[in-house]
Amino acid sequence: MGIKGLTKLLADNAPKAMKEQKFESYFGRKIAVDASMSIYQFLIVVGRTGMETLTNEAGEVTSHLQGMFNRTIRLLEAGIKPVYVFDGKPPDMKKQELAKRYSKRDDATKDLTEAVEVGDKDAIEKLSKRTVKVTRQHNEDCKRLLRLMGVPVVEAPSEAEAECAALCINDKVFAVASEDMDSLTFGAPRFLRHLMDPSSKKIPVMEFDVAKVLEELELTMDQFIDLCILCGCDYCDSIKGIGGQTALKLIRQHGSIESILENLNKDRYQIPEDWPYQEARRLFKEPNVTLDIPELKWTAPDEEGLISFLVKDNGFNEDRVTKAIEKIKSAKNKSSQGRLESFFKPTATTSAPLKRKETSDKTSKAAANKKTKAGGKKK
């Protein structure tokens, strides 16, 4: 879920903290990517038509491998150096949210069965996506693929978003890429949305600057964390009836959740019983992360290993894989040039910040009006 409604809240109240960037503008940049979020997107979109997905001869789904392979090559060809970060053990506080997701997926599975029985194609298309689950095997498959491609993998002790933020805070990477906004709450200095979108969508990358977020909202980092908890996060329920704008107003007025609770109209707003907001706050401020990782290296691809894994084990087209490997090798040579900023003083960016509602609304409408169709044969 991430932080409920945070993108719109920032677009309306902190537009200078957001700017649209071209995909190619991240040439030479090291970017930490939330792997689980990307895999989930690939399973939903790549090669899917209704209940049909890309599979190998054994009937095992390969959509995640197809998506990860192609999307990573696109990053490398643009001179971007991705670091994929995988989730570890979720914190206990997230178990309630995960249980809700499992319940919704079970409900969707039951509804999907009924839709199949009556032949409702629209319902099948919609419900089949709601039943998607990223498994441990999906993660292990992608880790193996990335290592064969010569792309670094980081296994987080807990939340991938928190680990990504820690890598960015400690200058291991330039920015964090995900679709969930949690990384901002964990303090990532720079956060990117839509970096992993397919090129066919033609949606610009949205870059968020956390320092400018705080400046625009006139909040401290502690207050921003409290704001995110009030908006709704993965760790605890929020106060019903308090949306983003009201939460921002209350934080500006009272400064903290404790002070808000002391002054809140209890007849109008129902506070969750035994509300663990303090523990949620602690998880954002003191997440379980590690910087004890091997040096991040982007190496030459293992050509034989890739052909064995993708072609022999998973039924990929050998000619396409061979050509893709050549793209990886060519991209590695290109990215070794590095950014000009390594040699010359950087100039000020010409990227314009978003206007308040107008640009945000136009971007949303443009995205809504375009549907992506993934290619690939069903097997």
From Swiss-Prot:
Residues 368-379 have a biased composition (Basic residues). Keywords: DNA damage, DNA repair, DNA replication, Endonuclease, Exonuclease, Hydrolase, Magnesium, Metal-binding, Mitochondrion, Nuclease, Nucleus, Phosphoprotein. CDD domains: H3TH_FEN1-Euk, PIN_FEN1. Its main location: nucleus. It holds the Pfam family XPG_N. Residues 355-364 have a biased composition (Basic and acidic residues). GO terms for biological process: base-excision repair; DNA replication, removal of RNA primer. This is Flap endonuclease 1. It comes from Zea mays (Maize). The gene is FEN1.
